[in-house]
């Protein structure tokens, strides 16, 4: 072979191989999962499924190494400040000592610290507990001796 552009063509079909490597991400654009072989140290090969979302390509980064391909999706969630009031429209700071709600586990400012003011989910169960406690207290205070008739 003296010319660089000449390529030797094998005579049998079994010897024909594809020379150019395929991009695994390009092949699976329309599939919902991609099975990647991940080799662990001396323990064998593990087959794992990695879900892909072809629509979220603008918010994700793709890294591929050797035998495994991974797709990492960044989640953009809105985090509240640690000491801000948990009420939706309030932006004031939560009270440190009196702002904790035991029923919904929220931290509220002095305006929204009461269960009625922040529309607590545990308001009905709290009312039932207080009603039962008052009934038990009244029953314990009642006199048990029969009344004397004159």
From Swiss-Prot:
Stored Pfam families: zf-AN1 (PF01428)
Gene Ontology terms for molecular function: zinc ion binding
Basic residues: compositionally biased ranges: 71-82
Binding residue positions for Zn(2+) 2: 101, 104, 118, 120
InterPro entries recorded: AN1-like_Znf, Znf_AN1
Keywords, in A-Z order: Acetylation, Metal-binding, Nucleus, Phosphoprotein, Stress response, Zinc, Zinc-finger
Entry-linked PROSITE patterns: ZF_AN1
Chain positions with N-acetylserine modification: 2
Residues that coordinate or bind Zn(2+) 1: 85, 90, 109, 112
Biased composition annotated in UniProt, kind: Basic and acidic residues: 23-33
Biological process terms in GO annotation: cellular response to arsenic-containing substance; cellular response to misfolded protein
Keyword Metal-binding: yes
Modification Phosphoserine, positions: 43, 54
Highest taxon above the source species: Eukaryota
Localisation per UniProt entry: Nucleus
Comp. bias (Low complexity): 53-70
Protein role: May have a role in protecting cells from metalloid-induced proteotoxicity.
Protein name per the record: AN1-type zinc finger protein TMC1
Natural source organism: Saccharomyces cerevisiae (strain ATCC 204508 / S288c)
Gene: TMC1
């Amino acid at each position: 072979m003296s010319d660089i552009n000449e390529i030797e063509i094998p005579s049998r079909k079994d010897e024909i191989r594809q020379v150019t490597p395929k991009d695994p991400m390009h092949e699976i654009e329309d599939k919902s999962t991609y099975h990647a072989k991940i080799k662990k140290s001396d323990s064998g090969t593990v087959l794992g499924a990695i879900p892909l979302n072809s629509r979220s390509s603008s918010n994700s980064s793709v890294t591929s190494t050797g035998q495994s391909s991974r797709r990492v999706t960044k989640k953009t969630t809105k985090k509240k400040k640690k000491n801000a009031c948990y009420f939706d429209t309030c932006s004031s700071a939560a009270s440190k000592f009196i702002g904790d709600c035991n029923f919904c586990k929220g931290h509220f400012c002095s305006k929204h610290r009461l269960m009625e003011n922040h529309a607590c989910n545990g308001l009905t169960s709290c009312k039932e507990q207080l009603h039962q406690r008052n009934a038990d207290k009244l029953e314990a205070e009642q006199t048990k001796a029969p009344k004397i008739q004159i």
